[in-house]
């Protein structure tokens, strides 16, 4: 019934849009839709993974991921998928995505992005290792797309790539994460005190630079 009303619900939201399951990782079930028929197909596919589906307005810009460890910014990396969308295939197919560090943005803009990421993580009460994904448009807008407190930790994942660019190799990064976890434990910080497990924000309602004080 809800699918039959999809056009009405979508209304004047516009296209293109990004469709994804609420609780999946690695962009599993994510798709870009250019019209109502594509939206319907994408929603049906996403429902195979989760009973709740997010539809976000597509915003064109430069995708920059920022790595943090215990509130400290490690660095940033620019993501350039050849397909135009950083989906599951772009993440795990060799050669499908170009990773550029430092990002090809003015240095003042990169610092602004990293500052925004740091404030977003702090506002959400994040601790330990996390990754903040930011979309930088041609204008003055910087959108927080996602704060991921369970970032990939294979040697080729983004957080280790960012750490490597900062001179921190994979074993040292793992040790730093463990040291931080031990410190939090000694201070009596429980998992319940870490208020955020995974947050995704629709692009048109995302944090902008002026929203975080």
Model region roles, listed by residue range:
Residues 3-10:
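A short helix/loop element that forms part of the nucleotide-sugar donor recognition site in Leloir-type
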Residues 10-28, 51-60, 64:
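ATP-grasp fold ATP-binding core
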Residues 27, 98-100, 155-159:
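Short small-residue beta-strand/loop micro-motif enriched in glycine and branched aliphatics
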Residues 34-115, 136-143:
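Phosphate-binding site of ATP-dependent enzymes
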């Amino acid at each position: 019934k809800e699918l039959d009303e999809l056009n009405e619900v979508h209304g004047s939201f516009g296209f293109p849009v990004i469709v994804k399951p609420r609780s999946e990782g690695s962009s599993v079930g994510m798709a870009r839709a250019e019209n109502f028929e594509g939206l319907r197909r994408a929603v049906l596919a996403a429902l195979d993974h989760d009973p709740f589906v997010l539809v976000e307005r597509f915003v064109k810009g430069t995708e920059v991921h920022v790595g943090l460890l215990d509130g400290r910014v490690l660095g940033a990396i620019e993501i350039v998928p050849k397909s135009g969308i950083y989906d599951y295939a772009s993440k795990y197919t060799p050669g499908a995505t170009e990773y550029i560090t430092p990002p090809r943005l003015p240095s003042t803009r990169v610092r602004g992005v990293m500052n925004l990421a740091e404030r977003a993580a702090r506002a959400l009460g994040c601790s330990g290792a996390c990754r903040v994904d930011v979309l930088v448009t041609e204008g003055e807008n910087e959108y927080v797309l996602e704060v991921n407190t369970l970032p990939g930790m294979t040697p080729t994942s983004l957080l280790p790539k960012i750490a490597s660019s900062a001179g921190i190799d994979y074993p040292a990064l793992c040790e730093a994460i463990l040291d931080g976890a031990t410190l939090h434990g000694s201070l009596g910080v429980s998992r319940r005190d870490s208020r955020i497990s995974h947050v995704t924000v629709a692009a048109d309602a995302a944090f902008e630079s002026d929203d975080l004080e």
